[in-house]
Amino acid sequence: MGVQRISIEGTKVKMEVTIELSRSMLTSEENIKQSLNETGCMVTEAALKYLDTDGSAIESAGAVMRTKGEQPKAYQTPYGEVVVHRHVYQRSGGGKTYCPLEREARIIMTSTPLFAKQVSSKLAYGSAREVQRDLAENHSPLVAVSYIQRLCEAVASIIETKEESWNYVPPKMDVEIHSVAIGLDGTCMLLCDNGWREAMVGTLAPL
């Protein structure tokens, strides 16, 4: 098996993939998945580099920033971890650095947009540890539970910020709602550090 990047011409990447088949269908499928993940990593690396600058000086907030050179950084993708050498900029007097690639690629923490979307979608239906297991068994990335939690918190904060400027048309109701029932109930939850605590739950139900 093997994956090779043949060429990059403009916005097109040409790859060559060799996959070994087996008398065991499961083995063949595992080989296919591994090769496709390797391909995904290599193409994603090219896609990220495509969004990077050529190293020329840039202007930000009225100040000129120059590159410190191409520095390596690992990014999490749906296909596995990818290390990209990208330009990092800084003002002549020092201070905070700036990476144009991460802004152009909409990197969240160190995650690509699709990986952040996949992880946050999975976490909506399970725990962070379940998401970690699912990623390891069915995809490729091996990420820590804490990273999954922090990534989803970052996605949620972005959504909250964007929600203020979003406009949408309320859906048309199939049946007119004449009244709404409001409920409030309490239960006890066991917290790791603080023992049992009462939690209140509210409900809204159309009648």
Give names to the regions the model predicted:
Residues 29, 41-44, 128, 145, ...:
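Alpha-helix initiation and N-capping motif
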Residues 50-78:
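Glycine-rich, N-terminal phosphate-binding loop and its surrounding beta-alpha-beta segment
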Residues 31-39, 107-111, 123, 140:
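Catalytic cores of large soluble enzymes that bind and process phosphate-bearing ligands
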Residues 123-136, 198:
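Short, charged amphipathic recognition helices of the HTH superfamily
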Residues 1-58:
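N-terminal alpha-helical interaction blocks
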Residues 1-22, 66-74, 81-114, 118, ...:
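RNase H-like nuclease fold core
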